């Protein structure tokens, strides 16, 4: 039986294609944040509990904003950024017209993977290399994004893949789910008086 093929990314009326962070990666990171910080108000000293109760949702908004990064393609060029609701305060992102993209440069990471940078064409009359911009590799439909990038720039993207294989995030998702389940069971035990925190 043939492997199922993921549906292509949707195309807006103006021809823009958007590539958000892959759902497996985004929701795993969000769940991991919750698993790590939800117990903190209960475990903290009484004087810090109210502050932590307020800090947890603020941190969640920050993680939601960071993981909302997306890549957009249209007839003019390539853009990397965030939705309007958080772009004004994150102030991250970049954009390049297609004709300004001159090369794709790999850089090895300390974990043995490779990240890729999109390099701007060198300005006429200068000897310095063009500025480089980090290319997101955790997006949904990465293979389609690379096909579009190669078709529009003529650069070879066949060597560009994900920084980490999917099984690493699948394993992290399972471990995170187990952490959340254990915390829910512990919370239920505390609520029923079946268990008490040390020092309480």
PLM-predicted stretches and their roles:
Residues 1-44, 130-131, 144-151, 155-184, ...:
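N-terminal membrane-targeting/pre-transmembrane regions
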Residues 3-6, 64-71, 99-103:
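Short small/polar-residue motifs
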Residues 18-22, 52-72:
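Short N-terminal secondary-structure initiator segments
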Residues 25-28, 41-57, 199-200:
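Hydrophobic alpha-helical transmembrane segments
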Residues 42-45, 50-53, 68, 74-76, ...:
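N-terminal start-of-chain detector that recognizes signal peptides
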Residues 49-52, 57-59, 73-76, 81-84, ...:
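A short linear-motif detector with a strong N-terminal bias
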Residues 61-80, 191-200:
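Transmembrane-cytosolic junction motif
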Residues 69, 80-147, 160-163:
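Non-transmembrane, membrane-adjacent beta-strand/coil modules in membrane-associated proteins
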């Amino acid at each position: 039986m043939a492997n199922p093929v993921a549906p292509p990314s949707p195309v807006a009326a103006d021809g823009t294609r958007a590539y958000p962070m892959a759902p497996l990666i985004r929701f795993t990171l969000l769940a991991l944040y919750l698993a790590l910080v939800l117990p903190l108000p209960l475990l903290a000293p009484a004087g810090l509990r109210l502050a932590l109760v307020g800090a947890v949702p603020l941190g969640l908004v920050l993680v939601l904003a960071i993981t909302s990064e997306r890549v957009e393609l249209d007839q003019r060029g390539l853009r990397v950024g965030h939705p309007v609701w958080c772009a004004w305060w994150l102030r991250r992102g970049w954009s390049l017209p297609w004709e300004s993209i001159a090369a794709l440069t790999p850089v090895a990471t300390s974990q043995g993977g490779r990240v890729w940078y999109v390099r701007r064409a060198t300005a006429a009359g200068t000897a310095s290399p063009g500025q480089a911009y980090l290319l997101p590799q955790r997006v949904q439909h990465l293979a389609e994004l690379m096909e579009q990038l190669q078709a529009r720039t003529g650069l070879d993207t066949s060597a560009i893949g994900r920084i980490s294989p999917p099984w690493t995030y699948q394993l992290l998702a399972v471990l995170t789910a187990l952490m959340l389940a254990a915390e829910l069971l512990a919370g239920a035990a505390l609520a029923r008086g079946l268990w008490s925190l040390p020092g309480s």
